[in-house]
Design a protein with these regions (language model features):
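Aromatic-rich carbohydrate-binding modules that target alpha-glucans
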Residues: 2-51, 59-80, 133-181, 190-213, ...
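An acidic-aromatic pocket/loop used at catalytic or ligand-binding sites
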Residues: 5, 93, 99
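Intrinsic disorder/low-complexity segments in short proteins, especially the signal peptide
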Residues: 8, 90-93, 224
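Intrinsically disordered, low-complexity regions enriched in Ser/Pro/Gly/Gln/His and often acidic
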Residues: 29-30, 62, 85, 161-163, ...
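C2-type phospholipid-binding modules
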Residues: 79-88
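Catalytic cores of glycan-processing enzymes that make or break glycosidic bonds
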Residues: 98-124, 128, 175-178, 209-893
């Protein structure tokens, strides 16, 4: 069989177009003018035919410098005739503007075509027309109509239906021997239910001159894009952590089985997306502090508490069954999660069931297939978990044995028959059940047209499987966090190590690629937590507790000479804490004398002090105050932290003699100590440094990583782009078609106090609040003056704002958000229920999930009613469904 590939691409000198995917090595095309490229290949095809997949790329001196968009690869079915010739006319594929429609969120759930048409009939002399039309749901199909009898003679009712076997690409093969040229045609949106044409495409007639085909030759015309004049697709969804779900059979915490019940409610209320928080294992000490879902010990393993024990099996011991039944009722009746009791009880169940069923399950074909596919991460995770409990610490550096990961030693421990194996294989068993359960929930959601949206944390724990097995990928001498923002005036210190991007780049970001690809098994959309981390990360020194002493990595620090070019004379004192008698009373009040006596020492007679040895870093101060949480101790501790961070510049961690202006220092005493000329000079360099200097640099950093990572799967990509946002972020997200996050009370336009919903970009996710924020009702009561301005200026109401957010007000705000321009409006469970006085939680304070400024937040929020009650809440469900329908977020085509 002969394949003739043809593509138009304007190259520069030294560049060549090549085909990849057909053979282990890419195949060069040839050109005479640097524009039109061709290649002719001979291929053996089995008699039953075969499908080939391929893509184009540009190489220079043997190096790939550009690839076309290949998330949805080119696919052609070849018949089995050895004498057949295929002439394939392609166009270069850039990332589509409507990339979201090609994501698995749409092709597998929202606009899925579960019953695909057969591969089109084949002809000796054929004309294959292929076109991309992703915005078509299962009740419609693409049809073709033209100036031929075989194409209906422009009668839309006689249009020929195309095959969706490779949806969202459509195709048809025409008998070229019966066609008259020139051929003219257009595409039609056809209603399969009503068996009639719905509308014509918006383009002019498409035209094809006589291709002069030979016998046994088929011409393939590919890469046509079809657009119809129909409304842009919009949908609504719910955001709720899995742990917060509550059914009548839950075991004190939401589980993967409960996800199916949430899907039922989403369908009942016309919602299309369920967004959850990370579900990875976070077990460090088995205490409630492990409840933080972003501090996982594995980027692959799921948290055992999410196992639905009903699906795992039934214990034969009747007494044990009775005991667990009683415990289930007790834990499930609690208004909030008792993390320790829930996990302890579930682990008792796991151990009993494993003794009863483990051997049989581990011998099953299903488990063996799962193990072979996942052993690369499953074995280290299981051993890590076993050793963590055996040595009573997740800090592997303190383990007496295996503190340094050796793959050979771990492999020996995992061999059946060893003393360690029963303890290790228990984790295999649990992870296998979790895999089956989440996969089942995912498939259930897809079947019902609902998307499960996951969450990828930006960081990993420094006491995790990955830090143990792959330490070369991380900078373990720093802490990731975030600069000061609306969430925390002192910045956030997450404690995670930062990534060694230079090492990751060398193997093509394999670590990240595997992570994304694993996630794609269970999710069709995901949120990149803190997407800014792919541009730069806020890195905090290990000696700091707060985030104020951090610096961006990578970054372009300033030299003394550059600092002084702004008019500020650089002094070494700017690197040291500025501590002066004049403001100590403001910081410490009645504790001032104690602080001066115990923690400070005088420098000279001018009133200057320095920290005493032993208290020069925030970590040293933290150590002193461990366990002292009374009001006075907290006051003194936080004041000492403030003194230590009261510096004007921070030294660069890599380059000696280079510096960073300290973030947010204008609020601190050291800045106030400058004269007006110095303040103005500092503000000029500060503005240049934080808002202009790095734009192009960080753009390039992001474009090294994000294109191949976001295109490594077909999941819909959403970025959490909140906080201190460089100007380059929106450019990158737009170039890569990543959905942004829009929150009205955190507007991206600094001129606005509240975001303008009608100005949100279409490629965005709109929400009222996130898990890191107070709910709508909670926010309404936080700052009455701000609420009043929102009530008058944004909602357009006259008079005095109510002191609480009434159901009517909440419904108005929800409706406004549903009417926004965003493709997705995903609201928290709490904000959805706020619109109904009967069903919303009477206690607003119980609805808060996380307070970012509190590093010891207990993540224990639960629904205040069960999913069964929710399904029966007809007035609420009807109201939500009607709101979604009448705001255009339940499209029928």
């Amino acid at each position: 069989m002969i394949l003739s590939f043809n593509i138009e691409y304007r190259t520069n000198w030294g560049e060549e177009v090549r085909i990849s995917g057909l053979f282990p090595e890419s195949i060069p095309l040839h050109t005479t003018d640097g524009i039109y490229w061709t290649a002719e290949l001979e291929l053996e095809v089995p008699q039953e035919g075969m499908t080939i997949n391929y893509s184009y790329q540009i190489e220079q001196n043997g190096i790939v410098i550009r690839k076309e968009w290949d998330s949805f690869s080119r696919s052609i079915f070849l018949s089995g005739s050895s004498r057949k010739i295929y002439r394939i006319n392609d166009c270069w594929k850039n990332i589509p503007e409507q990339l979201y429609l090609y994501s698995s969120a749409f092709t597998e759930a929202l606009l899925a075509h579960p019953e695909k048409e057969n591969i089109p009939q084949r002809y000796k002399k054929g004309l294959v027309i292929k076109a991309y039309a992703p915005r078509i749901n299962k009740d419609y199909c693409l049809a073709i109509c033209g100036n031929q009898k075989s194409l209906g003679h422009w009668d839309p009712e006689k249009a020929v239906l195309m095959s969706d076997t490779n949806f969202p690409e459509w195709q048809i093969e025409l008998d070229a021997s019966k066609l008259k040229y020139p051929l003219e045609y257009k595409f039609i949106l056809y209603n399969k239910q009503e068996k009639k044409a719905d509308c014509w495409e918006k383009n002019p007639n498409r035209y094809l001159a006589d291709p002069e085909l030979k016998t046994n030759e088929t011409l393939v015309i590919a890469d046509r894009y079809v657009y119809f004049d129909i409304p842009a697709w919009k949908g609504a969804g719910i955001a709720i952590p899995v742990f917060s779900l509550k059914s009548e059979k839950s075991f004190g915490v939401g589980d993967f089985g409960d996800l199916k019940r949430m899907v039922d409610w989403a369908v009942n209320t016309r919602q299309k997306v369920i967004q959850i928080l990370p579900v990875n294992d976070t077990t460090m000490t088995h205490a409630w502090t492990d409840s933080y879902p972003y501090n996982s010990i594995s980027i692959y393993a799921f948290h055992p508490m999410y196992a639905d024990i009903r699906q795992m099996g039934t214990l034969k011991d009747k007494e044990a069954v009775s005991k667990f039944s009683k415990k289930q009722k007790e834990l499930n009746s609690l208004p909030a999660i008792d993390y320790e009791a829930v996990n302890q009880t579930k682990w008792e169940f796991f151990n009993l069931l494993f003794r009863q069923e483990g051997e049989k399950v581990l011998a099953s074909k299903g488990f063996k297939d799962f193990f072979e596919t996942n052993k690369e991460w499953l074995q280290p995770y299981a051993v890590f978990s076993y050793l963590r409990d055996a040595y009573k610490t997740p800090n592997f550096r303190q383990w007496p044995r295996h503190s340094v990961y050796q793959a050979e030693d771990i492999e020996k421990m995992c061999q059946p028959g060893t003393a360690d194996y029963p303890h290790i294989s228990l984790y295999y068993y649990i992870q296998y059940h979790l895999h089956l359960q989440l996969l089942s929930a995912t498939e259930y959601a897809r079947q019902h047209g609902v998307v499960l949206k996951g969450d990828i944390p930006i960081g990993i724990s420094r006491n995790s499987v990955e830090a143990w097995t792959e330490p070369h990928y991380f900078n373990l001498d720093g802490q990731a966090g975030a600069p000061p923002d609306d969430f925390s005036i002192n910045g956030q210190n997450w404690g995670f190590p930062t990534y060694n991007w230079d090492v990751m780049e060398k193997d093509g970001y394999r670590w990240w690629m595997k992570r994304f690809q694993k996630m794609a098994e269970y999710f069709d959309a995901y949120r990149i937590d803190h997407i800014l981390g792919f541009f730069r990360i806020w890195e905090i020194p290990m000696h700091a507790v707060h985030g104020l002493l951090g610096q961006f990595d990578p970054s372009l620090p300033m030299s003394r000479e550059e600092i002084e070019s702004y008019g500020l004379t650089f002094r070494d004192e700017y690197l040291l804490p500025f501590i002066h008698e004049s403001f100590l009373g403001q910081l410490f009040g009645p504790h001032t004398h104690l602080v001066k006596q115990d923690f400070l020492e005088s420098v000279d007679d001018s009133g200057l002090y320095r920290m005493k040895p032993g208290f020069e870093t925030q970590r040293e101060v933290e150590q002193l105050f461990i366990g002292r949480n009374d009001e006075d101790s907290v006051w003194i501790r936080e004041g000492l932290y403030s003194l230590i961070s009261n510096v004007l510049f921070v030294a660069d961690k890599k380059e000696e003699g280079k510096y960073h202006p300290r973030i947010g220092v204008q609020r601190d005493f050291v800045f106030r100590s400058l004269n007006e000329e110095e303040k103005n000079a500092f503000n000029r360099l500060y503005d240049q440094y934080y808002y202009h200097r790095h734009n192009e640099f960080w753009y390039q950093q992001a474009m090294k990583k994000l294109p191949q990572l976001t295109q490594s799967t077909r999941m819909l990509v959403c970025g959490e782009d909140l906080g201190m946002i460089p100007a380059c972020v929106s450019s990158v997200m737009n170039d890569l078609r990543i959905l942004s996050l829009e929150i009205q009370r955190m507007p991206k336009n600094p001129m606005h106090e509240f975001g303008h919903l009608n100005e949100y970009p279409y490629r965005s996710v709109c929400t009222i609040s996130t898990h890191d924020m107070s709910t709508l009702r909670g926010w309404w009561e936080e700052d009455y003056q701000q609420t009043q301005r929102y009530y008058n200026a944004t909602l357009g109401h006259y008079g005095v704002a109510p002191t609480t957010a009434t159901p009517e007000l909440c419904e108005e705000i929800v409706r406004n958000h549903l009417n926004s321009n965003s493709i997705l409006c995903i609201l928290s469970f709490q904000d959805w229920l706020s619109i109904d006085g009967k069903w919303r939680n009477p206690n607003v304070a119980e609805e808060r999930i996380n307070v970012p400024s509190n590093p010891r937040n207990y993540w224990r929020y639960r629904m205040h009613l069960t999913l069964e009650q929710l399904m029966k809440a007809k007035t609420l469900n009807d109201k939500i469904g009607e709101l979604i329908k009448y705001t255009g977020r339940d499209p029928n085509k």
